[in-house]
């Protein structure tokens, strides 16, 4: 009897969940990892494991800052964020969410066993609750408040 390739099985289940939930991010991530795994690129796994999360945060930060860099958001709008109570509240919430995300990165790095649960929870939230797939770091941050940074 052939041995079960459990990492492949998990990736395929995540791909199916990504497709069913219309979560293109998870689907493309799984396809990328499958290509890396089954080609000579597989020697890049240690790099992806070590730097992938940091690289992803870098790309996300570039995306967030792009409207400022392109001039779509003017400097005056950034200043206005501190003058209106709704915008000031948005700044405070942004700070809190960034802090939670930082805790999430730490938790995911120190306790990788929680990553699968966070991913499954995110996919279920997208599929059943019409959520958006932006939550694993924040979810990990919230989890870290409950179980410790660890």
UniProtKB/Swiss-Prot annotation:
It is a multi-pass membrane protein. It is found in: Cell membrane. Keywords: Cell membrane, Membrane, Transmembrane, Transmembrane helix. GO terms for cellular component: plasma membrane. The chain crosses the membrane at residues 8-28, 51-71, 81-101, 114-134. It comes from the Bacteria. It holds the Pfam family DUF441. HAMAP family: UPF0756. PANTHER family: UPF0756 MEMBRANE PROTEIN YEAL (PTHR38452:SF1). Belongs to the UPF0756 family. This is UPF0756 membrane protein Dd703_1075. It comes from Musicola paradisiaca (strain Ech703). The lineage of its organism: Bacteria, Pseudomonadati, Pseudomonadota, Gammaproteobacteria, Enterobacterales.
